[in-house]
A protein has these predicted regions:
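Charged phosphate-binding loop/patch that engages nucleotide di/tri-phosphates or the phosphate backbone
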Residues: 191-215
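Generic structural marker for isolated residues within well-ordered, non-membrane alpha-helices
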Residues: 47, 78, 143
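Acidic-basic catalytic patches of nuclease active cores, encompassing PD-(D/E)XK
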Residues: 66-89
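Amphipathic alpha-helical interaction segments
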Residues: 21-22, 147, 156, 198, ...
Length: 238
């Protein structure tokens, strides 16, 4: 794993993320229509990622006031989490796999074996869906991605509503190996789709293709065992 110790939002941070399939977009990478076909959201994300891997820049993601509030409130949710649980948290940076295919930004480490993910309940619709109804489907893929990539023991999803008397609800997401395997399969399949778009774009530009990822590299054929003529086998010593 490679840790990129850059403040969030800086040019170095953005460069480290370029062309990387990230945990925050894992849900988009798995998105399909009612017929099970890749959705426009999935295909657009694949094309954006392929464009970045070819040296380009996808359109910047618009950050509205609600998104800015979510980023600003993260530190206060972390303080409340520590006060409630007694656990120490440590700063986390953007981390990628060695091949820089996949990456994620944890909100905080918990003893380097677990993590927290903070989601601020800015809109009332989000508040009631997640906190009241318990529907965390918008965030689950992101948390499972962290369990998969970093082999964490658990992720505490922190639903944060700072305007309420009891502002923090913690939902622990633990390892489910079958669920993690399904996500891994989908991420590898999505990367193959990105590679297809990348190859077609490089062909159109007349540039060299990139090296194949480790899981697509051909397996070398096993060397046959040497044969020995019967007369060449030495007689036993007894």
């Amino acid at each position: 794993m490679i840790e990129h110790p850059y403040p969030q939002g800086t040019d170095d941070w953005l460069e480290a993320r370029r062309g990387v399939i990230t945990a925050s977009r894992a849900k988009d990478a798995r998105d399909r229509d009612s017929k099970g076909k890749p959705s426009a959201k999935m295909l657009n994300y694949a094309m954006d990622t392929a464009r970045e891997r070819c040296g380009g820049k996808a359109a910047p993601v618009y950050q509205n006031a609600a998104m800015r509030m979510g980023s600003e409130e993260e530190q206060f949710a972390a303080i409340e989490y520590m006060a409630r649980t007694g656990r120490a948290l440590s700063e986390a940076f953007f981390i990628t796999t060695d091949d820089r295919k996949f990456g994620l930004s944890l909100d905080r480490w918990v003893d380097r074996e677990a993590a927290i993910e903070v989601k601020t309940m800015v809109s009332s619709a989000t508040l009631f869906k997640a906190m009241v109804e318990g529907d965390i489907s918008e965030y689950r893929d992101q948390c499972v991605f962290a369990l998969w990539m970093l082999r964490l023991q658990w992720v505490d999803l922190c639903l944060w509503a700072p305007d309420l008397p009891n502002p923090l609800k913690v939902i622990r997401i633990t390892r489910d190996e079958a669920e993690i395997q399904r996500l891994e399969d989908d991420m590898v399949a999505f990367d193959r789709l990105v590679c297809q778009y990348e190859a077609s774009l490089r062909k159109a530009m007349g540039t060299e293709p990139t090296a194949a990822p480790p899981w697509e590299a051909p397996t070398p054929a096993a060397s046959p065992a040497p044969t020995v003529a019967p007369g060449a086998i030495p007689a036993p010593a007894f």
